[in-house]
Structures are given as structure tokens and as C-alpha cells.
Curated annotation (Swiss-Prot):
Residues 23-398 are lumenal. This is Dolichyl-diphosphooligosaccharide--protein glycosyltransferase 48 kDa subunit. It comes from Dictyostelium discoideum. The lineage of its organism: Eukaryota, Amoebozoa, Evosea, Eumycetozoa, Dictyostelia. GO terms for biological process: protein N-linked glycosylation via asparagine. Glycans are attached at N286. It is found in: Endoplasmic reticulum membrane. Pathway: Protein modification; protein glycosylation. It is a single-pass type I membrane protein.
Amino acid sequence: MMMKSILITFIIASALLSSVFADIGGKRTLVVLDDLSIKKTHSTFFKNLENKGYKLQFEQSNTKVVLEKYGDFNFDNLILFSPTSESLSFSSADVTRFIDGGNNVLFAGSNVISENIRDIAAECGMEIEEDKTLIFDHFNYDKSQSDHSVLVADQFIDDSPIILQGLNKPILFKGIGHKIRNNPLNYAILTGSSTAFSAKAISGVSTKLMGKSCGLVSSLQARNNARVTFSGSLDLFSDKSFYSKIDNKESGNKEFVERLVSWTFQERGILRASELELVKISTESNSTVAPDVFTIKDEVKYSLKVEEFDGIKGKWVPYVGSLQLEVIMLDPYIRTFIKGDANGLYKIHFKLPDVYGVFTFEASIHKSGYSTLDHIYRKPILPFRHDSYERFIPAAFPYYATCFSMLIGTFIFSIIFLFNKDQLNK
């Protein structure tokens, strides 16, 4: 009996846990490698993922793998550590459909990039530099080495602590550069300094890419909240990189990669809305109508709870920030911003517009590093009933006076006309 109760408890707990993770990134991950020896040189990276519960399936780039079957995707995440392979079993169009399905992609490059990887990057708004080029910096490089292509990089993304969570340790980077397009969906996670430039690795001839426009690590968060991250260095994820040092101090490479990958695979920065409350607190009309029926110019209270997923704690916690609320019927009649409290509740009182129709109450959050939140609720707003208007409207007093003066004048004229007799001439 005891074993039965333990089994039932385990099943219920598993169901609850799966329901939580159903709202965030899944764990089925395909890892495509140029060479299976990368499993050894990058063992710490893969081990950290497995410790988090990710189910990794390793395949060589020339192995036939199907991402989608009968409309269902076989994986939730895709790791492409095959920058030079021209023999991928799936095309850039397949990867694009994978992203359109809401799945996540992490891929890395080297100083030689295959056309498949270039096409995938181009679809995601990233233009990779020519083959056999590297990013150089004659001022910000590892002084323990004579190689000026080993950068000491600390130009992290601003205004988005959710991606790197305030990481301030510099990292070592050696790889190819890229440029991101002017697109609000693209994030420059790590860029070169103002003295960095891209050049041929052998001849040293520089290209047009230079300064802070040199992308080292960039991401795309699609409109369906799928996340794609590209690193110009495959070595960034290696064991050697994780334990590298800068001026005899530990570098931030390992911490940088862990935070970057956890964000890419949707362990953080995922928002959800719940507990909507839209109630009437006062009315402009004189009649007593049902409380769930809204009429024009009613005073209403709007309340919405917003939470974000904490991958470390494995649960939803309140999101404290700002939220944009719009009341729309073709055009927005009301647009305002609401600050959340410590419990993640966003509340506001406002008066409905003096226009009737079916209105959309749209709450949205569009913030770098967080998933896009669009909560939509539709509600009809009715005009006043015939018995809801005031008996006399002050603005119409001049018209009332005109009507009554006309009536009185007509009455007086009628009396005079009826009872006044003209004197006959004799």
C-alpha cells in the first residue's frame, strides 16, 4: 500500500513538473558535430547541459537526421558545432522552419564557414565575414600571448541583465566576426571594442568591419519567441576556454557561456500573464445594469498578473517592471504604462472612452532579453440605454429655452389673433 502511494505521488509530481516545463524550452537537443572528437574537447559544456536534464543526441554532420516528421519536430533545441561541413543532412530552409516552429538554435563558427551556416546566419540577420579572417585588436588582447587575435572582450549587451545577468568579467575570444542588421529582433550580445577590426589571418589585410560593429556573439529572438545564438568562435565552448586566465585571474568564459546558453534554450526570460481582472467600479448612467456589462464612460479597474520563469529555482516568480496597456477599436483610444508591484500585479483605474463598440484590451511587454508578451482580451462597450440618459442635459439649455419661447410666443400670438377684433369703419 505504501509503495502504491509513493508511486502515485511520483506520477503526480512528474506531471506537475512536465506541465511547468511545457511552458518553457524543452530538453530534446540535437548536437551536430564536424568531428566526434569535439565531444572530448568540449566535454564540460556538454556535461553541464546533461546535468540540467537535457537529452543530447550527438550526430556527425554527414549523418542523415530528420528535424521534422509529419508536422511534429523531433527536437526542441539544435546545436550546430559543424562550421566547415558542406554535407549537412538538412538545409537552411529546414532550420528556418525549425525556428518558425518555436524551437531554439545555437551555432558556432571558425575562420572557415560553410555556405549552409552562412545561409542560416543570413536568415537570422547576421552577415558573417569572409573565410580565413579573424577579429584583431592591438590594444585589447591577451598580453600573455603574442597573438593579437586573442581578444580580451568585455563589450557586453546593455539594458538587458536577463541575458547575461550583469556579467562583468572579461572573456577571451578568438574567432571570425560578423555584422548584425538593423533589426530590433537582433541582439549584439558581445562586440569588439572601438579598436577592433576584421582582417585576413595570414596577410593581415583588413576588411570593412571594424570597431564596435564587429559582432562576436549575437542573438535573434523571433516574434514567436524562438531564440537563435551565433558565436564566431567554436573554441569559446571548449574546456580550454572555460579554464583560461587573464592576467593570472580566472576569465569569465565559463560563466558567460552558461548564462548565454541557458537564455538561448529559454531557461530564463520567459513571461506569462494570468489572473486578469476587469471590473466596473462606477458608472455614468442612471440605470442599474448588470455589473459585467460595460457602457461608455464607465470607470473600470484593470488588473493583470505577470510572472517570469526562474530556471535555477524551477518555478514562476513575479515579474516587476512596466507594462503597456492599450484600449483599441481600430485605433487606440487609451494608451498607458503600468508599473508592477512586488507581487507582479499591474493595476490601473481609468474611464472608458465615449465611443461604443467591441474594444480590445491589449497588455504587452517588449523588452530586450524577455519573451514577447501580448495578452489580448475583448469586451463590448455599449451605448447608454434610453432610460440611462439624464432628463435634462445642461448643454442643451439654450435649445430648451428656444423651444419653450417658441411655444409661449405661439400661444400668445394665438390668443391675440383669436380675441382681437378689428373695429369696423362706419
